[in-house]
Amino acid sequence: MARPAAARPVAVAITGGIGAGKSTALDAFRARGAATVSSDEIVHHLLAADEAVRDALVERLGPGILGEDGRPDRSRIASAVFGVPKQLAWLEALLHPLVSREYLTWREQLAELDDPPRVCVTEVPLLYEVGAEDRFDKVIVITAPRALREQRRRVARDDREARLLPDREKVRRADYHYVNTGTFEDMFEWVGGVMAELEAGAGARA
């Protein structure tokens, strides 16, 4: 039997630009006691374990995307779709519904635990771009100056972010906004305050 909504964890999404520090924020929430998962982790699982995904990738992109272990290799997939909008759109259309399914299953499993966490947090890079914000109770946007993000990622400027919603619009639509220009300790302290608010809200629902 499904638990009432009051017993379910507060569902939080973290989003932001490339190199802003989304994964670092997820680590901070994990350290503060939240249940966490990233879209990247879910994609890794799908590529490793879902035969239907493997077959679809080989049919579309060719057997060259397989690694030596016979599983889809993420770097080879990236090379096959980078700079080819049609292929990238196809890949996103294949994976995004599956990622959403896996995430919702994870969230349901958390709610069925004898002692479910009060807060569950997920890193979703394309949250607004794929229209997934309505699946979450709260949204956190992590931003940082462009030069700092490029330094963190060790990549040159390219057109990847041209496809993304501008930071100012993400911030306008979010519940929380953190400018990540400091240390992990700075973020950890900020996350502590957010967790206190989220847990208080979860308690009020119970």
Predicted segment positions?
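Extreme N-terminal, non-catalytic leader segments
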Residues: 1-11
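Hydrophobic anchor at the beta1->P-loop junction of P-loop NTPases
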Residues: 14
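P-loop (Walker A) phosphate-binding loop of NTP-binding proteins
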Residues: 17, 29
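ATP-binding Walker
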Residues: 20
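Walker A/P-loop
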Residues: 23
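ATP-dependent small-molecule kinase phosphotransfer cores
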Residues: 41-119
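Small-molecule kinase domains that catalyze NTP-dependent phosphoryl transfer to phosphate-bearing small molecules
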Residues: 103, 134-135, 146, 154-206
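ATP-dependent NMP and nucleoside kinases share a basic, alpha-helical "lid"
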Residues: 104-152
